[in-house]
């Protein structure tokens, strides 16, 4: 395999292919081609940034003017608009508007969504009824609903992932020493 993601896909396929698991590459040209308009509107019109700026409710994640990275030959760097050009940070790569338009049309697989766009991209290529996430993911998914509304994309039901707390015997003894039990921990520090 040429990349870690390719190796993981092959490994998962070998392990679970008989169970009907489908493994695909979200960076494939065909999937990225399906979001060319999303890429264009973000890069040329800063649509997501404008939605964020006009919203009373701000996202917990910083929303950039351009929310895509450019990928090529091991490089994955932010795209920024500087005067009349688009530059790829930490590289010598730059595009005029016409060159960027051509690159989006010819090589959409080179555009990688950042954390803000990933949620939207994920729902556009493989819509889910429910998204199960950790505490931080739930918070930022909920703050991104306005972006889904802008693109008329289905917003999934957000469900917090179940979690568990394991108390070591040492911690258990410390709690007992102070006359506390597990429930006391969840009452907040001012109520202990």
Task: Mark where each language-model region is.
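N-terminal targeting/trafficking signals and adjacent low-complexity tails
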Residues: 1-192
């Amino acid at each position: 395999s040429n990349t870690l993601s390719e190796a993981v896909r092959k490994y998962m396929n070998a392990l679970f292919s008989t169970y009907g698991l489908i493994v695909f590459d979200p960076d494939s040209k065909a999937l990225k081609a399906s979001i060319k308009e999303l890429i264009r509107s973000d890069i040329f019109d800063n649509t997501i940034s404008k939605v964020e700026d006009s919203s009373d409710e701000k996202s917990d994640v910083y929303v950039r003017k351009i929310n895509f990275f450019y990928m090529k030959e091991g490089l994955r760097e932010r795209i920024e608009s500087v005067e009349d050009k688009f530059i790829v940070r930490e590289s010598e790569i730059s595009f005029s508007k016409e060159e960027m338009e051509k690159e989006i049309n010819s090589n959409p697989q080179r555009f990688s969504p950042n954390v803000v766009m990933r949620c939207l991209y994920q729902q556009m290529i493989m819509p889910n009824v429910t998204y199960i996430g950790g505490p931080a993911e739930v918070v930022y998914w909920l703050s991104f609903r306005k972006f889904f509304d802008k693109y008329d994309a289905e917003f999934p039901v957000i469900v917090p992932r179940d979690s568990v707390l394991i108390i070591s015997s040492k911690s258990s003894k410390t709690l007992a020493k102070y006359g506390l039990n597990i429930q006391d921990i969840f009452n907040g520090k001012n109520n202990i």
